Amino acid sequence: MTLELMRGNEAIAEGAIRAGCRFYTGYPITPQNELFEYMARRMPQVEGVFLQCESEVAGINMIWGAACTGTRAMTSSSGPGMSLMSEGLTTLAAGQLPCVIVDVTRAGPGLGRIAPSQSDYRQATKGGGHGDYHAIVLGPSSTQEMAELATLAFYLADLYRNPVIILMDGMLGQMMEPVDFDRVKSLPAPEKPWALKGKGDGPRKVVYAAPFDDPGLIQLNQELVEKYRKIEETEQRWEEVHMEGAEVAVLAFGSAARVALDAVQAARSEGWPVGLIRPITLWPFPRKALANLRRTVRAFLDVEMNAGQMQEDLERVIGPDLPIHHLGQGGGKIIYPDEVYEEIKRLAG
């Protein structure tokens, strides 16, 4: 086992390269610049393509072109840049083109600040652009997991021919931890008979940004709904910690889950009946992990570095019968374990 000490931004870039990413384009924006810089160094070493684009709008459309050829392609940005990419993202979904987008979130709204925040949750999990579409959204909580989820992201993108967003925040992006790349397994890409190869000696292939008539668009939407239904059924991922006998369930993702875990372990050591559920797929939301808890848990604590965006998804699963409390806020305010610990004691007492 060989461990490499690196930032989260670097780990996700190296994980992407080991997954077979050979096209990267992006525009500098904090707090994701280390990812951008790492790709600039590494892509030439693996005979890949690195392009610094003139804007996020240009970048996401370059991803469209690369994805049309079947190349594993990735871009990255942060909140304001993701907003600029929204038209390209919905067009990628309409064209059913696989790609990976990394969102290293910063505090908002507006231009915001580079302080860590989880305020892009709603934007990512509810699509991010116009139309009825979804991106698969993964939420890592460690540097090791960033590298591992990068490989999973490309696999899922190819499997479902769909954009995948890796949603993390500036704290995770800048955090340095050891990474064991022996655990980062590249998942093979499937055959892509739809991809444009430019050879001219085979059947004509066309990738459409949208159908040209109403019946075609209606049919596309029906196909997307069926695809998303399959993804929701088969791709829910989560981690459970100390949920045996838990009467209070803490729900948190990303860096907030690291904070919540410290508090849950401290409370458990003192006998408080509390456990943690950490969503790994933010979309599809891990409803299966929560549905049966209505019979055993008497309260939920949603811990997020935003105004409670994931709480809305939790409420849809749990319904009105059990109390759901939120701890946290946006604007770059970091949550501390003692805050979560005190809230756990209040709810469990």
Q: Locations of the language-model features?
A:
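Peripheral docking tails and interdomain loops at the edges
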Residues: 304-349
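Redox- and metal-dependent alpha/beta enzyme cores, enriched for Fe-S-associated oxidoreductases
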Residues: 240-277, 283-289
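Conformationally flexible catalytic loops at phosphate/diphosphate-handling active centers
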Residues: 32, 161-240
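Conserved thiamine diphosphate
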Residues: 115-169
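Thiamine diphosphate
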Residues: 1-127, 134, 326, 336-344, ...
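Glycine-/acidic-rich phosphate or pyrophosphate-binding loops and their flanking alpha/beta elements
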Residues: 7-11, 225-248, 261
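Glycine-rich, anion-gripping cofactor-binding loops and their flanking helix/strand elements
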Residues: 265-269, 276-320
